[in-house]
């Protein structure tokens, strides 16, 4: 049913200290909205500094799509307090606006109302905005306003020294990369458990479907929302942030070199569909190039191997240089039951699950099995709470009840929890006991709880009431780790950093694009 992890768990129980010092970081996106729930038409608030260069507060696709970024930390409480302070400071400087508390947007009548994120006049800033212009023209702007939470995770070097028998990160980078790729393969095989518990987009506003074809059997709430009775995360479905043009890319997770090779091939592979758009229209750039991927970040994935880049390095070149440094989990919807979009239970569960993914045997995965794994995910995304829902084991081999597979996994996770709790208290085991109950009571999952609220109040009504409640909560509570002085210092520093960037440009934007936009970066619409 699931891999036999008993030997690895026994090893872990004999080496409990190797898990003390897990490093984490959180990125949370949220839309700025008006009091009636429409997208804010204002620019990025000046009190938040420059989104291009601010360390903690930036923008994602749209000018109204805020993104909060915590520094790397090994203390869960400190990370969540830091994230809370970013929300507190922002709320204090949003006078007539609120932060939308859900993944799926509402009240967007027209895509032309969505302003792309603006990053100033430097070449790098203009490049980032043009990349977003390309996303808009390729996939539509509405899809890009969907919000999520990204969780960055890395195991301490002490774990790898004991697990892979290495001496340090540099000499052991291949073993560490292999370990993280093992994690990724198991994530594809069993990560559907994340939307089962934490998917929080079982319904969408009717406006989200305007002009879009779907064969999904939506039902309507009295307030006009469209929902699937057992859905968990429509954000992760074909209606959400996915990219069908990437479905035939040969990107695998067995070896770092082949992963990078597949990624580089995709950013050089011409797309007939995107070539029809052209790179310029009426003399204005509308995308970086006409390849399947404009840049590597365009690759849609529920999890990514990462390394901090140096200078102008691409993400894949950074991986080749130093190996995988950490993992970015991208399957979390916004948690609507907390002002900051993510909570401690989720973080502790992800720790447990990702550690299990490293420990469990993970045979190499071909394209066929990857497609089978995606089918499992899709079943959970669209019908995860359906009574008797089953999960495919392998490709067409057999199907097992989701609850049965989940409970078998939790028997292992409880052993991991006891090891982690030896570093600090009993909270990991408590998380296991709390979540395991949801297999028998799926109405307790985020999607189950949220759907009941949406049926009663509508997405707009419930979302706006939460947005106002959280706004008042944030503005009326004190900072926990940061200060107004710290925020003001970072605001001023971000302004200076952006000004320095703009002064340092020595070539035109056209020349910059020739250097950085990859092949197939000229041509007009056909």
From Swiss-Prot:
The keyword Metal-binding does not apply. Its EC number is 6.3.2.2. It comes from the Bacteria. Gene3D superfamilies: 3.30.590.20. Pfam families: Glu_cys_ligase. GO terms for molecular function: ATP binding; glutamate-cysteine ligase activity; metal ion binding. The keyword Ligase applies. Pathway: Sulfur metabolism; glutathione biosynthesis; glutathione from L-cysteine and L-glutamate: step 1/2. InterPro entries: Gln_synth/guanido_kin_cat_dom, Glu_cys_ligase, Glut_cys_ligase. It is an enzyme of class 6 (ligase). It catalyses: L-cysteine + L-glutamate + ATP = gamma-L-glutamyl-L-cysteine + ADP + phosphate + H(+). Keywords: ATP-binding, Glutathione biosynthesis, Ligase, Nucleotide-binding. GO terms for biological process: glutathione biosynthetic process. One of its GO terms (cellular component) is cytosol. Belongs to the glutamate--cysteine ligase type 1 family. Type 1 subfamily. This is Glutamate--cysteine ligase. The gene is gshA.
